[in-house]
Amino acid sequence: MGQKVHPKGFRIGIIRDWDSNWYADRDYSELLHEDVKLRKFIKDRFYAAGISKVEIQRTGNRIRVTIHTAKPGIIIGRGGIEVERLKVNLAEMTKKNVNINIQEIRRPEMDAQIVAENVAQQLEKRISFRRAMKQTVGRTMRSGGIGIKIAISGRLGGAEIARTEWYAEGKVPLHTLRADIDYGFAEANTTYGKIGIKVWINRGEILPEAKQRPKEPKQKEMEEAGR
């Protein structure tokens, strides 16, 4: 049985970049664990803000945190009070100078992580999983998606035996490296147990810039002779 590679990791260095951008020798494991802690802290505190990802850059004694969110107002707060509190909390956790940058996600229907969390919230409100999947797929396709695929696993509808249900529309080519495939995962805590949601969204193709091939010697001679 074939297993699927993570679509984001598969495209790093081709059409995607790392979410953590720094270099370390001996402190690598400590900084890696610190990144995980920072992301978990931000995600847990502002779960309702629809956070897609948190990018972390380190230079010396400074940390630059970029939060990609669908609802920046929740993180900023009235008069910027919430973001200042967050800045202080992160500085206390890391003992370093922290700079926070917030980027708004204009089309949350095209972000796989936000879509997965939205489906999870619907399942926790006891909405039928089929209805939740169908509505979500329709919204994404209307927003300009080339294709979307959703997988929901667990005791669906309170069934005794766990199973996986799929719903897909359009094209989602997982092995086409130039295809901008976004992937998201979320969990819904229901009365019957946890239900896992996976979402793949095809947002089109990212083509590399066309490189001019050097002209061959014979071609150059012919062009010069023609002049």
Curated annotation (Swiss-Prot):
PROSITE patterns: KH_TYPE_2 (PS50823), RIBOSOMAL_S3 (PS00548). GO terms for biological process: translation. Keywords: Ribonucleoprotein, Ribosomal protein, RNA-binding, rRNA-binding. One of its GO terms (molecular function) is structural constituent of ribosome. One of its GO terms (cellular component) is cytosolic small ribosomal subunit. Residues 38-106 form the KH type-2 domain. CDD domains: KH-II_30S_S3. Pfam families: KH_2, Ribosomal_S3_C. Gene3D superfamilies: 3.30.300.20, Ribosomal protein S3, C-terminal domain. InterPro entries: KH_dom (IPR004087), KH_dom-like_a/b (IPR015946), KH_dom_type_2 (IPR004044), KH_sf_prok-type (IPR009019), Ribosomal_S3_C_sf (IPR036419), Ribosomal_uS3_bac-typ (IPR005704), Ribosomal_uS3_C (IPR001351), Ribosomal_uS3_CS (IPR018280). It comes from the Bacteria. Belongs to the universal ribosomal protein uS3 family. Binds the lower part of the 30S subunit head. Binds mRNA in the 70S ribosome, positioning it for translation. HAMAP family: Ribosomal_uS3_B (MF_01309_B). Part of the 30S ribosomal subunit. Forms a tight complex with proteins S10 and S14. This is Small ribosomal subunit protein uS3. It comes from Syntrophomonas wolfei subsp. wolfei (strain DSM 2245B / Goettingen).
